[in-house]
Each structure stands twice: as structure tokens, then as C-alpha cells.
Amino acid sequence: MRAKTFTWVLLLSAALAGAAWYYLGRDAAPPDLQGRLLFPDLRAVLTGARAIEITTADDSFTLESLEAGGWAVRERHGYPAQTATVRRFLLGVAGLQIRSRKTSNPDNYARLDLTAPEDDSGSKAARVVIRDEDGGEMAAFLAGRIRPASEVDNPDPDRGESGLKDLSQIFVRLPDAPTVWLVEGALDIARQPTDYINRDRLTDTPRNSIRSVTVARPDADDLSVTRAAQGEDFELQNIAAGMQLKNQFQLNDLVDLFVNLKFEDVTSADEIAWAGVGDGNSGDGGAGGIGLSATMFAFDKSRVVMEQGEDAEGKPWIRLHAEPPPPAANSTDGENAAADSAEDGDAAESAAPDTSRANELNKRWSGWAFQLPDFRHDTLNRGMDELVEAEDEADGDGDDEAGG
């Protein structure tokens, strides 16, 4: 009995040891790797990063460093990327820590969203490659399923409270290696090139400074909303007899195109057909609205012009141009101002318009075309018939009945 018992103990111990080896080999990193950075040397050379390539099943794009500083999106004709967003991304990659080793079986890749996007059209993975100025790989990995911060079981207390809200765990694979690692860090891998662009506040004119907005289209009369003084409501001009404004909000929506406008995509203005350019149906007033423009006039007599064009697929885009106030707008004496003395010369110089604001806006807008959300394009293309309705005749009917 003792010999048999001893044999069973040996067998059980061997089984437990095998199970422990199997568990550690699959679900825990070796002690010398757990908590180690996935790319231990990256942070020290991070300033040498010159390109970030992100590939998914749906898209592939490159963020590239500019010699003058900052970053740009190559597939958007070099439109500026948000430097802070790119920097946060690079620091996020450099800060990824190994938490555990998972499977090496390719049959499990799909479950972890780690099939290669180049080979699987349904892949949910994102391939990330960071390159130096010579094109060499500084870091490369395939990112799969993400556990958001709310699902992270044991966040590292050493990261501090400020870092916990952005903490997540990601299943990753390194190039030419079958092993899947679970890593942890503050990394958000945005999947669209426009996610790295600041798309907010394309226009930012203070509402109180706007005097009027006029929309001109090739197939209809101009549509204009205006007000006499700051703080007043905007009024729709040239309403036909017997008609009235449906509601004030629609006029405010038109003005808001110049107050706080967000765009969805950007391309070179050369890629878009504008009025009199290309073979676009520039006078048909169709969905694209080639030839349509909206002009915002400010109380200081500066203005912003928004022109609408369309791409090869007929989708509408806009471009913008700012113009400073004319010199007379700042002159107190008008055309009769004397210029005989030094004082008059100083007055004329002081009357020169401030062009800094217009120059700043044109630097931001020049050469670019912007795609707006659909509801913004709808606002821009809204006609007079959509803004007015027949006047309420209830009072008149009441008078007739009283007179009868």
C-alpha cells in the first residue's frame, strides 16, 4: 500500500507540475518579462520617430513628421495632424507593459481580433509601424482586441490616479512571431486618418460680430439674412407678400456655418470641381451645388466667403476665403481726410485695416477643401421655399366673421 501510495503521489505531483508549467507558459509572462516594456528601448529614441503607419482592413495611412516641426497626414495631401495627439500616441506605444503571455496557436487569433488585415478583409486588427528617418522600424506590432479601462482587473497602482482613466489592455503580436501578448497602457489606436486631425472650429467668428449672411446660387435669387445691430435677431430679407418665416432657428443655423463649423474630411482644393472649373454641371443647382456660395459680412466690414463644389462622385465640399475690412472702414474722416500734415499722415496710417485675422484664417484654409456633415450641407443649400410658409389667416377669418 505504501508503494502504491507513493507512486500515486509522484504521479499527482507530476501532473500538478505539468499543469503549472502549461498555465505559466500560456497565461503568465516569465518573472523577468512581466511588467517589462514591450519596446524597452523606444522611449529613449522617440524623438527620432519620423513616420507612423497604421493599417486596417478598411484603410491604410501614414502620419509623417515635418521638417519645420509638427506632423501631417500623407493621405490627406499633407494636411496638418494634431501634434499633441501624435505625441500622445507615441508615448502610449513606448509605455506598453507586458502583463501576460497568451496563446501561440493561430487558430485563436480570430477570437482575439489578431488576424492580419492584409490577409483577412474582416480583420479587426490594426498594424502599427513606427519608423525613423531612414525608414527603419523603431517599433512594430499588430493590435487586436482591447479591454477598456473599466474592464482592467488590476491596474498598476504605480501609474497614479491620473493615468488610470486611460488605461487599457490590448492583445498584440510582434512581427514574424506567433506569440500573443496581453499588454497594458494608455494607448488609443484611432483607425481613421481624420481622427488625427483637429476637425473642430473650422470657422470661429464670434456670433455677435456678424451683421449678415448672403447665399448666392446660380439657379435662384440670392437669399440674405441680416440685422441692424449687434444683439438683435437675424431677419430674412425679401420675403414675398403673403408669406412669413417658419422659424428663427433655421436662420440661426445658416449664421452658425461661420460661428462654429466642424468638418468631417479634408482634401486638396485641386481635387474638387468649382464653378467654371472642369466638367461639373455648374449651373444646375443639383445636390453638389457647384456655383453656390455664402458670404458672411461682419460689422467691421470684414467678410468670409464659403464656396461649394463637388468631387468626382458628386459629393459636396467647401472652400473658404477671408477678406479684411477695407481701408475706409477704419477711417474717421473718409475720403475728405486731409493729407497735408504729418498728423494727417499718421491718421491715414492708423486707418489701415487690420489684416492679421484674415491672414491667419487664409493660412489655415488656403489650398484645402472641406467636407461638412450632411446637415450642414443641407443648411447651406436650403432655399427660400424651405424657410417660409403662408401667413396665418386666422385673425383675418375672425374679422370676417365678426363683420358678418
Please tell me what each predicted stretch does:
Residues M1-G404:
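Soluble, acidic/polar mature domains that operate outside membranes
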